[in-house]
Amino acid sequence: MSPRRRVLLLSMVGLLLAGGAIALRVGARQPAETSALAESLAGIEAPAPTTTTTSTTIDPARQSFRAAHVGIPSVNLYPSAAASQPQLALPNPTDENVPLVFLVREEQGSRLKVAIPERPNGTELWVDKTDVVTTDVPNRIVVEVGARRLTVYRGHSDEAVMSATVAVGSDATPTPLGDFYVDISVAQTSYTPWILSVAGFSDALQSFGGGNGQIAIHGWSDTSVLGRNVSNGCVRVSFDDLWRLRDLAPVGTPVEIVA
């Protein structure tokens, strides 16, 4: 496993949450899983090629966001829309055997500027449009750390479709602030029935449980912790709210964590 992307060691047989920051364990992807991923991406129409060189940020009036699903085994990421040499290459599936997904921030000509699940927080690079398949994402998540509240909004609007009291990081291991996104959504069998991995990393923990301190939104059976600062950086929700989140926040959903 590369030192760059030892974030989540995902497993369908075990999850070590140990209070907040996540460390997941899994075996190799089965051929059927890889085939299913290929089939699902094959059914999505790829974006039409374009020759324009005008830089366009995502329209604030747009009622959805865009996720970029990588469609090749290894994807190059560039420091600018015009760069000829890549700055980074990421495997797909990832080292954790899960599909690689980005959040689209901007587009220019034949490339998209995307947020990626890498340290440091807020890293954004450019990817060729031909290397990804984009899908619309309907909602966004806002986590208010001080209020210990999570709200799901419809698109860019102020229309709330869900609100929940949550537990957040302790004073020693605070939940990081910033603009992130859901990069993995997967069932688990220990501590939480489902987990939404967030492409953000703890500022206090450079490593945790075999990973490098990536945070997540996950369920917690003891609801007495909700409304408190008790985790190692993750956002804990009740199981009932977790199921609602799973349906409202597919991969690529923006996650804004504010004070």
Task: Please identify what each model-predicted range represents.
Residues 34-49, 55-63, 116-143, 173:
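Boundary regions of SH3-family modules and the immediately adjacent low-complexity/disordered segments
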Residues 63-65, 70-74, 99, 109-111, ...:
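Extracytoplasmic
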Residues 22-34:
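Hydrophobic single-pass membrane-insertion segments
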Residues 1-17:
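N-terminal export and membrane-targeting signals
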Residues 94-130:
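SH3/SH3-like beta-barrel superfamily modules
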Residues 10-15, 50-57, 131-140, 173-177, ...:
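Exported/periplasmic cell-wall-interacting domains
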Residues 81, 108, 116-120, 131, ...:
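A mature extracytoplasmic/lumenal domain signature
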Residues 34-38, 43-46, 56-103:
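Beta-loop motif signature
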